[in-house]
Amino acid sequence: TWIAYLVAGLGGLAAPLFVMIFGWGLVRSKSTTNGNIIKATILLLLQLLVNLFSPHLFEPLTPGILSLFALLILIKPLIVNMANNNISFLVFSISIFLIYGLSSFIYNIQGTSDWDSRVSTNNVTILVSHLFLTGTYPLFPWITFAVVGAFLGSSITEGGKTLPRNNTTLLLIIIGMSYCLVSLILANEEGSVWAHPTKGAYLNFFPANIGFMIGSMTGVLIFWLIIQELQISLFEYCGRLSLTIYVLHFIPLTLLSNIENERYWSVMEASLAVVIYTTAWLLFAFVWNRLQWLTIEALIRKLSSG
């Protein structure tokens, strides 16, 4: 239904936006090499904590978005170079499309859509593969959002804005929206699933196919423009506490999952639950913003600056 697509679509933008904001902060960070190593270590430990919070989703050592952040911190010099050098940025963009072409027509390097396979960590080889290619949030292709975020962070425009309102931005959004509209029409005519976490014919999250990358990048750019132009302080509060919220939100999410298993929710019930749950975290960020010292972000800053 359209409600399911709307709620799932907004939820699907959370991770891309999270990674893009991380890239934006990465290029603006003044941390030393030792500080970055400490941050990466803490993020890996937090990934373990998240996995333990959600045994119904992950194995203890399953790589996820926080282990992705750890890798991004460790390769920060490379990301900064691509963000500040137009030629490097262009080469990176072309490389991403070439790798997708290779994966689609020659050899599937992203693994299967089976969830159990993507979270399984039976041996070191699989663990490393999940970190870079076949996991839930592997370095490829999710590094793309970080590089774009870093690019925006290094190109401040008028009034301190990072995403310029120009013809290039408008053209990118139009191309992305056109792809989504055309693919939605084709999926409807074919009777196939347009977008799905693991079974999407055109937009697939696990693994993140090229359609998902186009659609989510378009959505994030639109969302970024809206927040930038309207200067919505509530979202700014969430941005400051994004890591704390991400780690903590798995605790009640696990409880909600147990409730859903006991009684199957309808699409309307599930959608309403998502809206209420999301709103609750917005309010949490507004209140907790006064207690910045009591956040995971503050803890990481303190440990990495010592």
Describe each PLM feature range.
Residues T1-G306:
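Alpha-helical transmembrane segments and their immediate juxtamembrane cytosolic regions
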